[in-house]
Amino acid sequence: RLPVETLSAFNQLFRKELGSNNVSTFEEGEFTRPSARFATESGRSFEGKLDDLKTADSILVLGTDLVRHHEVVGFFAKRLLPSGTKLLVIDQKENDLAPLSNKTLRATKSSDEDVLSALSAAIVKLGLAKGKTAVKAGDLDGLASKTGLESEEYLDAAYVIAASEKPVILFEKGITPSAVADFATLIGARIISIKGGANNLAASQLKLDQPLNLKTSKAVVVFAGDDEVSQKMTNEVEKVPFKVVQAAYASPLTAAADVVLPSTTWLEQDGHYLNLDGHLQEAHRAITPAEECMSASEALAAIATGFGIALEDNWEKELHQQVASVELN
């Protein structure tokens, strides 16, 4: 929930000025790193916008539960169904959208990439392909068998997603973006990836998306704000000899800290947020914080001053330092 300004200042201070190569976010790029890498390698933004979802006549939800974890996007998808938009759900787990779908593929014996390959063969067999693929119609039985599902299941699913003019694919972590992009080309679909928490896309653009390794760290600085810190992350931080934590609420993490800095909540701070659509939005504080509580940006500026460091306000330029998975605006 930290604004872009804070993420930029955090990156400047600890990576660029103090030389740490172990700077990231709580999610460690889990939702964004593969897509960011694919965009960099291909040299282009490959995702569409939420506006594409509004006009979709078929939707593929791939490996994500929009009801449980991404309610806003889930609402956009669900409200289209009464008007005739078709829904295909592919997930190895139980998915709360499945009861609303026209077809659900739950292949627990294989990867989502394998399922897309079998589905591609079914699309080719039905003559619904709009783009090229190396998969052939004759591959269907073998590919379907590999996933533990019958060929007929894939033929049904192929008709749901490919017999339409404006298909949209919604996907999350756990599948290779290049595989999704290839499948999208086959059926002429737009792609939207679900990017996790607020400002995850901004963190990715600032390269704050790498896995953390705290095993040899002697000190750690955590700016939690009012975010909830996982038990796994708390356990990792607790092992570090010296811990500084800025947080809005008491938690096991603050209890283990050597230094605790009181923090404002997201309602008590100004700043910018980059949504999954690539749209930059400005938030204004709704509540005046207590005098003793600094925002994360103010705390970082104070720490930087103590080191004799002047932080630059160039976060907008930094957001465009690499190709994003979705066009920024």
Over which residues does each language-model region extend?
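Cofactor-pocket helix-loop regions in the catalytic cores of large enzyme subunits
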Residues: 1-329
